[in-house]
């Protein structure tokens, strides 16, 4: 598949090969990661990458766009069908740019926005001080109830009434419970705010009908196209309002982007077609079953799951019961070829670079074909490693590392990813 890269640039070929090996023979539990199909990968590697196409289908600033127009129309139409909306912009290069485009469509610098605090499960683009959203806007963060660890809707309403935001953002990157979009819309309407839902993490679950569709309540919905959607890395913006759609289009181009990535848009179209199948719906159901099983098995073995469980593809694990930090856990598990990410938890006492938790997700494991019984095996592996972490640097006895690596490789070999499908 990469013969030309191998001939032209052996160093990059080696990087690709090593990364393929890492994915093929390691357990991927980062909640925001997944494995794209070969059809999606092929579309991304096509000659469509050569075409500049500033503007939108039928209104381009360059000639020769007749075929990329077809690709973009297919992507838009499939996105609209998938999420039951009237309008879709599939040009954002990323979820962050989708959020930026959505914000800029309905607000001005200095306006007040509300978003979930990063330490409570939100995202950088929901108002973090280090992000454009925290630098451009006056940000009022909301969080979870300290006892239940679920969104405190009373607090959201009180803050909205007090600060009168222009935008209320719902969604997050480490929140495992179903969000009440109806309640959010009621609060937004009460204060005259736009409700923007960032469904990047759970878009695949929405597409499969096992998570409420935010488009029924939000003025604007943003998303990535990877994660649970299992497509290429990119973003999109959805709405049912024609005037908002016009503003969104202007906001993306010429507002914050120039030429769209047509090879990625074609891959988005492929991804949406895959997501419209019954097989995809079954896949998403299994993702949630696996997440619930993994959370229960970890809890059974002494770890604490934030909010007591999960309704989605991800969970936030509090490591305090084992007196291990998120940083140490990420390093230790990584040595054993189990990939996770450290994550702050509600009421965090450590810095984000150390953290008290890890975030786990099941989309990538489920793509391999793993089910509940494998989640039990994986929970056992995770806890066994964590119980043997010796220090803040994630050091673990070599005997434990070698034993776990072997078990991980055996498990991955039982559920091959691209092995036999890609010619190396």
UniProtKB/Swiss-Prot annotation:
Molecular function GO terms recorded: glycine hydroxymethyltransferase activity; pyridoxal phosphate binding
Modification type N6-(pyridoxal phosphate)lysine: residues: 227
Family stated for the protein in its record: Belongs to the SHMT family.
NCBIfam families: PRK00011.1
Protein name, as recorded: Serine hydroxymethyltransferase
Signal peptide location: none
Pathway: One-carbon metabolism; tetrahydrofolate interconversion; Amino-acid biosynthesis; glycine biosynthesis; glycine from L-serine: step 1/1
Record's keyword annotation contains Transferase: yes
A Pfam family of this chain: SHMT
Catalysed reaction equations from the record: (6R)-5,10-methylene-5,6,7,8-tetrahydrofolate + glycine + H2O = (6S)-5,6,7,8-tetrahydrofolate + L-serine
Chief localization: cytoplasm
Entry keywords, A to Z: Amino-acid biosynthesis, Cytoplasm, One-carbon metabolism, Pyridoxal phosphate, Transferase
EC number(s) given by UniProt: 2.1.2.1
Cellular component, GO, one term: cytosol
Domain of life: Bacteria
Role of this protein: Catalyzes the reversible interconversion of serine and glycine with tetrahydrofolate (THF) serving as the one-carbon carrier. This reaction serves as the major source of one-carbon groups required for the biosynthesis of purines, thymidylate, methionine, and other important biomolecules. Also exhibits THF-independent aldolase activity toward beta-hydroxyamino acids, producing glycine and aldehydes, via a retro-aldol mechanism.
Compartment(s) where it occurs, according to its Swiss-Prot or TrEMBL record: Cytoplasm
Positions of disulphide bridges: none
